[in-house]
Amino acid sequence: MRKDLIELDGSEGGGQILRSALSLSMTSGQPLRIRNIRGRRSRPGLLRQHLTAVRAAAEICAAEVEGAELGSRELAFRPGAIRAGDYAFAIGSAGSCSLVLQTLLPALLAANGESRVRISGGTHNPLAPPADFLRDSWLPLLQRMGAEVDLELLRHGFVPAGGGELLARVRPARWRPLQLEHPGAALRRQARALLAGIPGHVGERELERVRQRLGWSDEERQLEFLAEVQGPGNALLLRIDCEHICATFCAFGQAGVSAERVAEQVATQAIGWMESGCAADEHLADQLLLPMALAGAGSFTTPRLSAHLQSNRRVIERFLPVRIGDQALDGGGHRIVITSA
């Protein structure tokens, strides 16, 4: 694979461009330069979560890095050889552990031995996939594609306190293609209201609204109290296990937002996905594109194309010899198809 310098404009997207570019630079060996990082955001440049991802990526592949500073709007990253090992990274805030781990996994799956990665920060952050999504929805699909990863949620961490912790065990693997046309029949459903230092009636009201909107039984709805020291925090998670996929939807309690409104948000997400008949919801689609591209082929259906998916597609096609196509479905939605370029 060529080792030409890849130059990207980071102004058109947020941290997604940075994370995908780091993953691809590590796995392909191609040096990277990003300008205007998060240029259109209210707080442009690298935040703590992004900086942790950069420094972690650099440690794993012995990269030469310029611009790895808080607030930096330009980054140069020249990767070396990927090294298996026992790693620990602390974000130092409630920044997302999930997003940092997703940045590192493709490289560690290409390493020369087994690795352990411990990441501390936010495990349940409204601006990122919760750890439950990684464990229950995303990683099982990667495992079907050949990835060998085990993930433990050691401690929950909510915004703004953080303090959560994930532990991943990663073994070298070879990617293989995956096709996801539809979810298949629903097999199991579960709603969980997580409460850490939050009154129990908040979760009870959330679960009652889930019953009203979705008709889920008492056995399918669960109140889960976490240690107060892990809070304050509240998340409502819906999990739908189907024949071919497990879908996870999440909404977070926030000041000024009623418990009923939180439940409405997550129920609306789930209903929209179920009615679409597509395999991957919008957020899962964002996260599937890169591993499928690394496999060199694959396809999935999704109800709509997010801005994240569109910008991610452009970054991937700069690094890898793949073509990512979009086919409109007759009943609505899209089929994303990855083929060799």
Curated annotation (Swiss-Prot):
ATP binds at residues 102, 283-287. PROSITE patterns: RTC. The active site is at 308 (tele-amp-histidine intermediate). It holds the Pfam family RTC_insert. InterPro entries: RNA3'-term_phos_cycl_insert, RNA3'_phos_cyclase_dom, RNA3'_phos_cyclase_dom_sf, RNA3'_term_phos_cyc, RNA3'_term_phos_cyc_type_1, RNA3'_term_phos_cycl-like_CS, RNA3'P_cycl/enolpyr_Trfase_a/b, RPTC_insert. The keyword Ligase applies. Gene3D superfamilies: RNA 3'-terminal phosphate cyclase domain, RNA 3'-terminal phosphate cyclase, insert domain. SUPFAM superfamilies: EPT/RTPC-like, RNA 3'-terminal phosphate cyclase, RPTC, insert domain. GO terms for molecular function: ATP binding; RNA-3'-phosphate cyclase activity. Its EC number is 6.5.1.4. GO terms for biological process: RNA processing. GO terms for cellular component: cytoplasm. It catalyses: a 3'-end 3'-phospho-ribonucleotide-RNA + ATP = a 3'-end 2',3'-cyclophospho-ribonucleotide-RNA + AMP + diphosphate. It comes from the Bacteria. It is an enzyme of class 6 (ligase). Disulfide bonds: none annotated. Keywords: ATP-binding, Cytoplasm, Ligase, Nucleotide-binding. Belongs to the RNA 3'-terminal cyclase family. Type 1 subfamily. Catalyzes the conversion of 3'-phosphate to a 2',3'-cyclic phosphodiester at the end of RNA. The mechanism of action of the enzyme occurs in 3 steps: (A) adenylation of the enzyme by ATP; (B) transfer of adenylate to an RNA-N3'P to produce RNA-N3'PP5'A; (C) and attack of the adjacent 2'-hydroxyl on the 3'-phosphorus in the diester linkage to produce the cyclic end product. The biological role of this enzyme is unknown but it is likely to function in some aspects of cellular RNA processing. This is RNA 3'-terminal phosphate cyclase. It comes from Pseudomonas aeruginosa (strain LESB58).
